[in-house]
């Protein structure tokens, strides 16, 4: 089997060296070259024909987003962005994901010794995942970006760690012990529970842009760094008719509102005498993730019951698949994004394997199905 050819683009010689060392440690990956700026990268893409690029977000002469825009227009390639974990870095990274970048990782730190193995594992996994993304998928995402820019959707006037430590593998039970759902005979509000990972920031945007302000409450767990979740919520708030916020502990869950899990806390849904509230939990990662989709889904089973709708979008791994099965087993309708429109059909694919998906739909059909199900 031929190796995945990677071109590293970064203005820092030290970062280029670190990334090269990490990627070369994987027998399935070959680093075919490095470039210090986008002009150098442009020539090396033509010469070396890489399968995947790692691209620094912020560089001199031409920034990573401008280069990515030209690349996706002229020579689409899977790209993993190397991002600084800052508000500015978050904004640039989200624009890169808009353009068609497959995923992102934090820029490696100089004092990486204690987390070197974890970082190496993460970037190698993401490069290998990116290599499976087709040219057609990249072209479709870029066309969607251009269409959204040309349509200039009105921005509504509203207020508005990627390097994980070595952790034990915990199950959902470590955060939310399994128990029978409460009595849901009394009428209560609907809640839509949505989970996503790789490719999810764009998929979530596509869903939220098509839901009216009258939609019931939505709780979202997206795998994302802690410093990125608030900018992500603000970005979603600017394109949605619903009010989108980063969830806060004990925040009431209201219709017409969207609550996004902070990047370093599990989001739980709790039922009170007056309705539902968000609870934030600082327990260990589950399925190697914090926040975890399975954890959120478990609490929706226990607190919302049949008044919920479960949705699982694009993402690497299996987080959310078991939780979706638990939702389905109590009669909650479940929707999974189909393989063709996913960046990575990991989490949705695992849900399908478990028989947990009532509906397997292309991304563009999911908002309509959500609206149909909440009327039942």
Swiss-Prot record:
Entry's localization field: Cytoplasm
Superkingdom, natural source: Bacteria
Top-level EC class: hydrolase
EC number per UniProt: 3.1.1.61, 3.5.1.44
GO biological process: one example: chemotaxis
Keyword Cytoplasm: yes
Domain CheB-type methylesterase: 185-376
PTM: Phosphorylated by CheA. Phosphorylation of the N-terminal regulatory domain activates the methylesterase activity.
InterPro entries: CheB-like, CheB_C, CheY-like_superfamily, Sig_transdc_resp-reg_Me-estase, Sig_transdc_resp-reg_receiver
Active site, UniProt feature: 197, 223, 319
Keyword hit for Hydrolase: yes
GO cellular component: cytoplasm
Pfam families: CheB_methylest, Response_reg
Keywords: Chemotaxis, Cytoplasm, Hydrolase, Phosphoprotein
Domain comment as written in the entry: Contains a C-terminal catalytic domain, and an N-terminal region which modulates catalytic activity.
Free-text function comment from the UniProt entry: Involved in chemotaxis. Part of a chemotaxis signal transduction system that modulates chemotaxis in response to various stimuli. Catalyzes the demethylation of specific methylglutamate residues introduced into the chemoreceptors (methyl-accepting chemotaxis proteins or MCP) by CheR. Also mediates the irreversible deamidation of specific glutamine residues to glutamic acid.
UniProt record similarity statement: Belongs to the CheB family.
Name the UniProt record assigns to this protein: Protein-glutamate methylesterase/protein-glutamine glutaminase
Gene name tied to this protein: cheB
